[in-house]
């Protein structure tokens, strides 16, 4: 009887404890929610003085105002920046998150030069499943340490080693384009992108994937599909929660793509690490380094040997993060710049003629591979690339998460705000670029650029978190463009309004880049 009574008492105690725990959890949840609402209301009130586009509603902000279609959304943002060009900055609420749009050089400088405002936007978290916490997505001390370790790997003398790869892949591209000579206009965007993918894969990993020959490979498909899925997820707040995302078809496909990408990279890292260990063993027994003496050096080789201030090497997971980051950042952006350059040259034959004259001065009629010295002499072509990136920056907007309260143009911007820099609008400021819609490479002649605000032009970002690979990118762009333009004359009849600009992770023409090719020797004007 006593045992039965004790059992009943124990059950009641358990029930009471469970009820208390549920009540406590519920109270904690309500308290947390109230704190968030109070913080949101405080931010709302404190940021009220900042100019905005229209009335924002509590909790949803301007979300109901935003276009859902990628093309329409980008066009909407650009229209806002044009309409409010006279304003120093512009506030938007995306749900409960405040954003300030910056498209004025003086105010962009405030954010980009700060050694404290270096945290990337929270939206970059959707890249983390693929890229981990590499150079693009990491913050704070990890980013500082990683940046310091990796900066020497992008020294120009090291980049020179990659020129042979760039020349080889550019020649493959030219052969692929031959079939379009004197034919109807065709979309060149995918051709250029596959060439850039081959280059970044071989320079980053030392692996020739032959994307230009086999664009249907599993890895190539996974790279493209992953970029698309990440952008789509960013636009759909209801898919932001990981557990919820995995309940949908998109989440399953995302996981499948990650497995393909990570397996490929892990295998390449393991294979190269084993080769390097074997080389060391050979040297240790006095047999030289024959196993890989003819193997080209890749970024991966440098990552396997780089150390921090304390002599620690990167783990294989760290290396995978950086290799995947190079893959993600190093092909789409460069391919976009080359495509936009071809489009603008095709629309501006007088500029193309100047480029051709410069190419003749440097190469004559030879089709030999470009050397580092050749590329240095292509100064006008470099101005063409710079002007292209002014009009069509590969990354049309990027963001920083404000890590502490700051003042911009006399307005208080609170911690937790997303500061969105819009190069597409910034580069069209008529104070620094008169007749901003005109294609004028001469803007970047030294005498014409003198005195221009240093933050009026930021195609590779600027400040502490500028693009570490910008020299690599320009080198690749000059190599590929010089190879194409030595063989072909470009024509383009597309009007800008026909391009269908879409500001995804990069600035894409949703309708493609359509050009005609003529053999330069025979048909050059």
UniProtKB/Swiss-Prot annotation:
SUPFAM superfamilies: Cytochrome P450 (SSF48264). Its EC number is 1.14.14.79, 1.14.14.80. Keywords: Endoplasmic reticulum, Heme, Iron, Lipid metabolism, Membrane, Metal-binding, Monooxygenase, NADP, Oxidoreductase, Transmembrane, Transmembrane helix. Inhibited by N-hydroxy-N'-(4-n-butyl-2-methylphenyl formamidine)(HET0016) with an IC(50) of 38 nM. The chain crosses the membrane at residues 13-33. Its cofactor is heme. One of its GO terms (biological process) is fatty acid omega-oxidation. Pathway: Lipid metabolism; fatty acid metabolism. It catalyses: dodecanoate + reduced [NADPH--hemoprotein reductase] + O2 = 12-hydroxydodecanoate + oxidized [NADPH--hemoprotein reductase] + H2O + H(+); tetradecanoate + reduced [NADPH--hemoprotein reductase] + O2 = 14-hydroxytetradecanoate + oxidized [NADPH--hemoprotein reductase] + H2O + H(+); hexadecanoate + reduced [NADPH--hemoprotein reductase] + O2 = 16-hydroxyhexadecanoate + oxidized [NADPH--hemoprotein reductase] + H2O + H(+); (5Z,8Z,11Z,14Z,17Z)-eicosapentaenoate + reduced [NADPH--hemoprotein reductase] + O2 = 20-hydroxy-(5Z,8Z,11Z,14Z,17Z)-eicosapentaenoate + oxidized [NADPH--hemoprotein reductase] + H2O + H(+). It is a single-pass membrane protein. One of its GO terms (molecular function) is long-chain fatty acid omega-hydroxylase activity. It comes from the Eukaryota. It is found in: Endoplasmic reticulum membrane. Heme binds at residues 329, 467. GO terms for cellular component: endoplasmic reticulum membrane. Pfam families: p450 (PF00067). A cytochrome P450 monooxygenase involved in fatty acid metabolism in the eye. Catalyzes the omega-hydroxylation of polyunsaturated fatty acids (PUFAs) docosahexaenoate (DHA) and its precursor eicosapentaenoate (EPA), and may contribute to the homeostasis of these retinal PUFAs. Omega hydroxylates saturated fatty acids such as laurate, myristate and palmitate, the catalytic efficiency decreasing in the following order: myristate > laurate > palmitate (C14>C12>C16). Belongs to the cytochrome P450 family. This is Cytochrome P450 4V2. It comes from Pongo abelii (Sumatran orangutan). The lineage of its organism: Eukaryota, Metazoa, Chordata, Craniata, Vertebrata.
């Amino acid at each position: 009887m006593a045992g039965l009574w004790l059992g009943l008492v124990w059950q009641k105690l358990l029930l009471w404890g469970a009820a208390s725990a549920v009540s406590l959890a519920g109270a904690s949840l309500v308290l947390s929610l109230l704190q968030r609402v109070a913080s949101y209301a405080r931010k709302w009130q404190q940021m009220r003085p900042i100019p905005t586009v229209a009335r924002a509603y509590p909790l949803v902000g301007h979300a109901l105002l935003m276009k859902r279609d990628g093309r329409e959304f980008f066009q909407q943002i650009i229209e806002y920046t044009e309409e409010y060009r006279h304003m120093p900055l512009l506030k938007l609420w995306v749900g409960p998150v405040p954003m300030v749009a910056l498209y004025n050089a003086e105010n962009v400088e405030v954010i980009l030069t700060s050694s404290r405002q270096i945290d990337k936007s929270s939206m970059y978290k959707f890249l983390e499943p693929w890229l981990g916490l590499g150079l693009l997505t990491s913050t704070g001390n990890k980013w500082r340490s990683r940046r310091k370790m990796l900066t020497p790997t992008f020294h120009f003398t090291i980049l020179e080693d990659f020129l042979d790869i760039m020349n080889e892949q550019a020649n493959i591209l030219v052969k692929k384009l031959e079939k379009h000579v004197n034919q109807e206009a065709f979309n060149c965007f995918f051709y250029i992108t596959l060439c850039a993918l081959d280059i970044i894969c071989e320079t980053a990993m030392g692996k020739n994937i032959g994307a230009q020959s086999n664009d249907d490979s599993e890895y190539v498909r996974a790279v493209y599909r992953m970029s698309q899925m990440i952008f789509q997820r960013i636009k759909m707040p209801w898919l932001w929660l990981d557990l919820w995302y995995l309940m949908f078809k998109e989440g399953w496909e995302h996981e499948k793509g990650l497995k393909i990408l990570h397996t490929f990279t892990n295998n390449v890292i393991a294979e190269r690490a084993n080769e390097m260990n074997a080389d060391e063993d050979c040297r240790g027994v006095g047999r030289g380094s024959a196993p890989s003496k003819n193997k080209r050096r890749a970024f991966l080789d440098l990552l396997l040997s780089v150390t921090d201030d304390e002599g620690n090497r990167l783990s294989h997971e760290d290396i995978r993060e950086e290799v995947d980051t190079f893959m993600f950042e190093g092909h789409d952006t460069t391919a976009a710049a080359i495509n936009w350059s071809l489009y603008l040259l095709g629309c501006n034959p007088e500029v193309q003629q100047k480029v051709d004259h410069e190419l003749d001065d440097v190469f004559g009629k030879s089709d030999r591979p470009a050397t580092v010295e050749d590329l240095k002499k292509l100064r006008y072509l470099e101005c063409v690339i710079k002007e292209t990136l002014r009009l069509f920056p590969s990354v049309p907007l990027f963001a920083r998460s404000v890590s502490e309260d700051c003042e911009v143009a006399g307005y208080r911007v609170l911690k937790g705000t997303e500061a969105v820099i819009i190069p597409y609008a910034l580069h069209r400021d008529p104070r620094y670029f008169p007749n901003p819609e005109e294609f004028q490479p001469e803007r970047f002649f030294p005498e014409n650029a003198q005195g221009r605000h240093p933050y009026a032009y930021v195609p590779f970002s600027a400040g502490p978190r500028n693009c570490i690979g910008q020299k690599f990118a320009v080198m690749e762009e000059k190599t590929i463009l010089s190879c194409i333009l030595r063989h072909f004359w470009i024509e383009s009849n597309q009007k800008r309004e026909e391009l269908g600009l879409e500001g995804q992770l990069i600035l894409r023409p949703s309708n493609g880049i359509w050009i005609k090719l003529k053999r330069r020797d025979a048909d050059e004007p």
